[in-house]
Amino acid sequence: MRVRILIAFAMLLTVPLPGLSRAQDASMGSGIKVNVTGFRNDKGQLGCSLWPGPQGFPRDDSHILKHIWAPIKNANGECVFGGIFPAGDYAVTLFHDENKNGKFDSNFIGYPLEGYGFSNNAKAQFAAPSFDECKFHYDGAGWKQISVKMIYR
């Protein structure tokens, strides 16, 4: 049991430090808001990652600009990436951490066991979509609002 707790804690440390913030960034005057719908239940939490470019997308967490955890209520969630971000193209990846273990669970062949989603509602066919399929433009001022629907397999 202690080993599992230590492993889970170690995995949480791999999330970039800015990601330790939660959804309270809404008090800031600008940023990116992601409305997420289609959860199959309200268990666990919503993990949201903001990517500033194609490098490492979507698997190398070291290239994530910001990661946050948000609650799920009535099959909906909202990720608020508040703060000053320069104008440019960004992408968002999300997952429904149903068991609240801080990671995206998959089976031994990589088949998703939890829900996930991408900005632009890009679909994963035999592989994850590319950054170009998921990117959206943020002009660097005010709030950019996007919507994503969760996918379950």
Model segments located where?
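Bacterial N-terminal signal peptides
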Residues: 7-16
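Extracellular beta-sheet/turn segments enriched in Thr/Pro/Gly and aliphatic residues
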Residues: 25, 115-153
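Sec/Tat signal peptide C-region and signal peptidase I cleavage site
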Residues: 17-25
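A short, amphipathic beta-strand motif
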Residues: 30-38, 48
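Short proline/glycine- and polar residue-rich coil/turn motifs
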Residues: 70-76, 137-140
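Acidic, glycine-anchored loop motifs typical of Ca2+
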Residues: 98-106
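Exposed aromatic-hydrophobic patches
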Residues: 78-84
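A short tyrosine-centered beta-strand micro-motif
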Residues: 88-94
